[in-house]
């Protein structure tokens, strides 16, 4: 029995090493440049004109390593889902019906690049090298205890976050669709990037409509902890 167990462990290890070697043999940078760059900005800077924002096809990726978590990237690249329910630029997806504006869901599609596990790992590895070196690290400890009630009051009543972002509290989902959904932001986003984005949205995207709101470090930290807890 012991030898069977050791043999099984050895086989599992060999399989893992084989997968790692396969992933390392795949050129993630080449895939990003050939498959992603046609829609995503992978070199920067972000658009500085309204026209540039309107022409943006997909979110910028030139700071993906600062923004995302690698495990989420690997999973998402294998099965892309819609994160922005009104599209990257909602004005490009508005239709008028009965005198009212609405979002046309038929024009909003998930990313077409559905990669194998090995390719997803290679692409994620490359994306994680695309970082903003000026972003502070370790600003927020995601394991820190915080008041859920205070955080919910802040994000839903004192600040306009739910006007653009979908939020989830238990089984209840609230909020708008013009911004990226935050219902699983804890899996997707680096807490330090969340904090930095709240602190100065225009640093990351000069023409974003997300407002820069002055607040204390404690409130910004509270928002970051709440958003990071959304899984």
Residue ranges and their predicted role:
Residues 70-78, 82, 120-124, 191-199, ...:
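An amphipathic alpha-helix signature
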Residues 24-45, 136-168:
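Sequence/structural segment immediately N-terminal to covalent heme-attachment motifs in c-type
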Residues 29, 43-76, 90-102, 166-196, ...:
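Gly/Gly-Pro-rich "capping" loops immediately C-terminal to redox-active cysteine motifs
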Residues 33, 38-46, 66, 78-81, ...:
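Detector for the c-type heme attachment site
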Residues 98-138, 211-231:
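C-terminal capping alpha-helices of c-type cytochrome domains
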Residues 17-25:
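Sec/Tat signal peptide C-region and signal peptidase I cleavage site
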Residues 7-16:
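Bacterial N-terminal signal peptides
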């Amino acid at each position: 029995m012991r030898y069977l167990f050791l043999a099984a462990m050895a086989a599992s290890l060999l399989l893992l090493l084989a997968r790692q070697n396969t992933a390392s043999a795949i050129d993630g940078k080449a895939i990003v440049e050939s498959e992603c760059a046609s829609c995503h900005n992978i070199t920067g800077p972000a658009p500085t004109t309204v026209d540039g924002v309107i022409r943006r096809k997909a979110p910028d990726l030139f700071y993906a390593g600062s923004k995302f978590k690698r495990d989420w990237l690997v999973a998402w690249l294998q099965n892309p889902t819609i994160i922005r329910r009104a599209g990257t630029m909602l004005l490009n997806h508005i239709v008028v019906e009965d005198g009212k504006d609405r979002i046309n869901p038929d024009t909003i599609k998930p990313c077409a690049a559905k990669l194998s596990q090995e390719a997803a790992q290679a692409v994620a590895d490359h994306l994680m090298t695309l970082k903003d070196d000026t972003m502070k690290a370790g600003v927020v400890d995601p394991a820190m205890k915080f008041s859920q009630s205070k955080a919910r009051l802040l994000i839903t009543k004192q600040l306009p976050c739910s006007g653009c972002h979908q939020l989830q509290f238990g089984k209840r989902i609230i909020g708008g669709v013009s911004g990226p959904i935050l219902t699983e932001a804890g899996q997707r986003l680096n807490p330090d990037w969340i904090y930095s984005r709240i602190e100065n949205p225009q640093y990351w995207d000069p023409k974003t409509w997300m407002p820069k709101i002055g607040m204390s470090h404690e409130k910004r930290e509270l928002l970051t902890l709440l958003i990071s807890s959304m899984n």
